[in-house]
C-alpha cells in the first residue's frame, strides 16, 4: 500500500479548496488536494457555471453587500459579509491569475 504524506491535506478541489491549497503552498507547506473527481470537476464551483456572486462591473462595496444580504434573506453573518465585500475583488482576481476560472 502506498503512503502519501503532506503537511496540509485539502479536501475538495473546487475554488475554495484550491484557494486553501495555494495559500498553504505559498506559506511553504507541502500540500495534497483530494477531491471526488478530477481537478475542478464535480464541485459546487463547476455547478455554479460561473454564476459567482462577486462585485462585477464596478459595483460598489455597499451595493455588493446589499446583494449578498438580500440573497441570504437576512441570515448572513454580518461580519463575514463585510469581509467578503472588501476581499472579493482581489480574491476573484487571484483565481483568474492562477487559471482556476
Language-model-derived ranges and their functions:
Residues 1, 21, 69-72:
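A short alpha-helix capping/helix-coil boundary motif
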Residues 2-16, 32:
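Beta1/beta-strand and adjacent pyrophosphate-binding region of the FAD-binding site
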Residues 16-20, 42:
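Short glycine/serine/threonine-rich phosphate/pyrophosphate-binding segments
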Residues 20, 33-35:
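Hydrophobic alpha-helical segments, principally membrane-spanning helices and signal/leader peptides
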Residues 24:
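Aromatic pocket-lining residues of Rossmann-like dinucleotide-binding sites
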Residues 36-101:
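Conserved N-terminal/central alpha/beta ligand/cofactor-binding core
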Amino acid at each position: 500500500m502506498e503512503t502519501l504524506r503532506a503537511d496540509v491535506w485539502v479536501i475538495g478541489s473546487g475554488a475554495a479548496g484550491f484557494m486553501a491549497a495555494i495559500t498553504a503552498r505559498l506559506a511553504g507547506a507541502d500540500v495534497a488536494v483530494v477531491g471526488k473527481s478530477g481537478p475542478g470537476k464535480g464541485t459546487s464551483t463547476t455547478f455554479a457555471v460561473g454564476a459567482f456572486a462577486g462585485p462585477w462591473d464596478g459595483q460598489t462595496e455597499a451595493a455588493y453587500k446589499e446583494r449578498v444580504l438580500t440573497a441570504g434573506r437576512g441570515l448572513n453573518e454580518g461580519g463575514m459579509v463585510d469581509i467578503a465585500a472588501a476581499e472579493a475583488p482581489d480574491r476573484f482576481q487571484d483565481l483568474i491569475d492562477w487559471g482556476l476560472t
